[in-house]
Regions:
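Macromolecular interaction modules
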Residues: 1-104
Length: 104
């Protein structure tokens, strides 16, 4: 089974809040999410084209593990934490399945 991914895109419109958001994500949110989701890898990105755009990606072993996480309580708790700490940050979520991987 191919790997599956959970992607969260956040728009941090206030430039003055981006450093605090970045620290919170690095020190609290990603470690909590990795532990709660039981994922094998996680990444975070800031867009080079749009400085307000932050993206986090979590890799699951397969679609079944991603689907189980989406139905579980861990996601609800992490969403509640995000809403509490960053109520003005809009975000969207997407689920993906690996179609191809190329490595040289």
């Amino acid at each position: 089974m191919p790997a599956a991914f959970f992607v969260v895109r956040a728009i941090v419109t206030d430039p003055g809040k981006r450093a605090a958001f970045d620290r919170w994500y690095e020190r609290e949110h990603v470690p909590d999410a990795v532990k709660a989701f039981g994922v094998s890898k996680a990444w975070r990105f800031w867009s080079l084209d749009d400085p307000s755009l932050h993206q986090a990606m979590y890799q699951f072993d397969d679609e079944a593990k991603l689907a189980a996480m989406l139905k579980g309580d861990a996601l609800n708790q992490l969403v509640a934490d995000f809403n509490r700490d960053w109520p003005d940050v809009r975000r969207s979520r997407e689920t993906l399945v690996l179609a191809q991987e190329f490595a040289k």
